[in-house]
Curated annotation (Swiss-Prot):
Taxonomic source organism: Woodchuck hepatitis B virus (isolate 8) (WHV)
Pfam (any one): vMSA
Virion surface face residues: 2-214, 308-379, 430-431
Family of this protein: Belongs to the orthohepadnavirus major surface antigen family.
Subcellular location per the Swiss-Prot or TrEMBL entry: Virion membrane
Sites of N-myristoyl glycine lipidation: 2
GO biological process entries: caveolin-mediated endocytosis of virus by host cell; fusion of virus membrane with host endosome membrane; virion attachment to host cell
Region of interest (Disordered), residue spans: 115-147
Protein name in UniProt: Large envelope protein
Region (Pre-S), start-end ranges: 2-207
Superkingdom to which the source organism belongs: Viruses
Post-translational modification: Isoform M is N-terminally acetylated by host at a ratio of 90%, and N-glycosylated by host at the pre-S2 region.
Amino acid sequence: MGNNIKVTFNPDKIAAWWPAVGTYYTTTYPQNQSVFQPGIYQTTSLINPKNQQELDSVLINRYKQIDWNTWQGFPVDQKFSLVSRDPPPKPYINQSAQTFEIKPGPIIVPGIRDIPRGLVPPQTPTNRDQGRKPTPPTPPLRDTHPHLTMKNQTFHLQGFVDGLRDLTTTERQHNAYGDPFTTLSPAVPTVSTILSPPSTTGDPALSPEMSPSSLLGLLAGLQVVYFLWTKILTIAQNLDWWWTSLSFPGGIPECTGQNSQFQTCKHLPTSCPPTCNGFRWMYLRRFIIYLLVLLLCLIFLLVLLDWKGFIPVCPLQPTTETTVNCRQCTISAQDMYTPPYCCCLKPTAGNCTCWPIPSSWALGNYLWEWALARFSWLNLLVPLLQWLGGISLIAWFLLIWMIWFWGPALLSILPPFIPIFVLFFLIWVYI
């Protein structure tokens, strides 16, 4: 845009100055016209005039294009409050028109915020203007420390920021580009007028990934893992005690450590120190116990996946089947990754026999059918398994809890009744 221009008009003229972009309006008939308040920031600018006459002619033509009754031709679709409708007081009679001079100012592009410079007071004419030609305009200086000016202009920039916020729209930018008095210049780096609030020292703020609820969940998870680990160690120690007791029906004796290289105190075989000969055997038993626990965990995971239907296995004896053309039966269980799955056989007749894979317990059904094909007596367990399958999950948990706590005590009571239980079971199956 053009540079800011300071102009002093003749006493019989009135000028309204928008200093942010250098827009001027004037008239030679100010008796019934409005006097606009300076400091309104617009998005239009005048090309730097060469002399006072050129400036007056351009401003008068520009002023005549505006219909002050309907506000047609005004550069921005916005009405401003009137300051006064009375003509300004007449200045001193002998005051003559002064020449204008160009002052450096910031380059402003519509839509980009910039910091306006303060108004420069008029300079008194010197002898250089009388005997010599006007001094050529000084090139604009580069503002290398804009933050120093922002510190003192914080309160003055509030109105400027509000004005630019209303002017950075698509319609007003279109009006600015369509104005014949608009000149554009390349954009320059500017300093934002929005000041960030001062930061306070203290505890660092938690990131969104580590909210207080997630932190509490992590701590609770660590406690659960520690609790389970201690329980696993306790279970391994109890199983080790049970395994050792199988070798000593009369009770587990104490290990004195007399035959070892290093004399040790009396201790149990399930808690041998490293200097005892039974230390390596104790850890071998513990290692086997941990492998068995891991195997149980894998079996539990396999059962869970089979229950969800993630293990597609073709059944040995399908319950439902369909016969289709072999050209349509080209997808096997190994080629599909989303249920429902389908198993297909391609006989020589040209037709395919397809049957669906169960959506749940496919592997279990396959293993059960395979066992029934080799052990026919397993059919006797079908009613019992069907009855157990009808028990709710809560009943299973209660049964496991009762066996866990009362099982060892019931072992000494139930052996006499085991034959009776077997007899009742056979009667219930065959009758």
